[in-house]
Amino acid sequence: MSIYFPIHCPDYLRSAEMTEVMMNTQPMEEIGLSPRKDGLSYQIFPDPSDFDRCCKLKDRLPSIVVEPTEGEVESGELRWPPEEFLVQEDEQDNCEETAKENKEQ
């Protein structure tokens, strides 16, 4: 069993008051957009004629060629994996191989 308690809130408008508000407000058709003072306008949505032009440009991918570089790393350039990491891996591999050889003997 549920008990209903009416909400007593000063901000709450009863339906009759809300109907009165809705009937007395200005219709949206009569509310016009006033031009800006400087007279400049801006477009929110893209122009449909620009859509075809953009689609034609997107059909072709840009041709970017990246060539691998050999030699020293320039200052500030990062490479992965770092050289220190490669040295540590080689040392670990050598240790593992030595351990396997010792077990086999």
Swiss-Prot record:
<comment type="similarity">
    <text>Belongs to the LBH family.</text>
</comment>
<dbReference type="Pfam" id="PF15317">
    <property type="entry name" value="Lbh"/>
</dbReference>
<feature type="domain" description="LBH">
    <location>
        <begin position="18"/>
        <end position="104"/>
    </location>
</feature>
<keyword id="KW-0539">Nucleus</keyword>
<keyword id="KW-0217">Developmental protein</keyword>
<protein>
    <recommendedName>
        <fullName>Protein LBH</fullName>
    </recommendedName>
</protein>
<dbReference type="InterPro" id="IPR042945">
    <property type="entry name" value="LBH_dom_prot"/>
</dbReference>
<comment type="function">
    <text>Transcriptional activator.</text>
</comment>
<dbReference type="GO" id="GO:0005737">
    <property type="term" value="C:cytoplasm"/>
</dbReference>
<dbReference type="GO" id="GO:0045892">
    <property type="term" value="P:negative regulation of DNA-templated transcription"/>
</dbReference>
<dbReference type="InterPro" id="IPR038990">
    <property type="entry name" value="LBH_dom"/>
</dbReference>
<keyword id="KW-0804">Transcription</keyword>
<feature type="region of interest" description="Disordered">
    <location>
        <begin position="86"/>
        <end position="105"/>
    </location>
</feature>
<feature type="modified residue" description="Phosphoserine">
    <location>
        <position position="63"/>
    </location>
</feature>
<keyword id="KW-0597">Phosphoprotein</keyword>
<feature type="compositionally biased region" description="Acidic residues">
    <location>
        <begin position="86"/>
        <end position="96"/>
    </location>
</feature>
<dbReference type="InterPro" id="IPR013294">
    <property type="entry name" value="LBH"/>
</dbReference>
<keyword id="KW-0963">Cytoplasm</keyword>
<dbReference type="GO" id="GO:0005634">
    <property type="term" value="C:nucleus"/>
</dbReference>
<dbReference type="GO" id="GO:0032991">
    <property type="term" value="C:protein-containing complex"/>
</dbReference>
<keyword id="KW-0805">Transcription regulation</keyword>
<dbReference type="GO" id="GO:0045893">
    <property type="term" value="P:positive regulation of DNA-templated transcription"/>
</dbReference>
<dbReference type="GO" id="GO:0043408">
    <property type="term" value="P:regulation of MAPK cascade"/>
</dbReference>
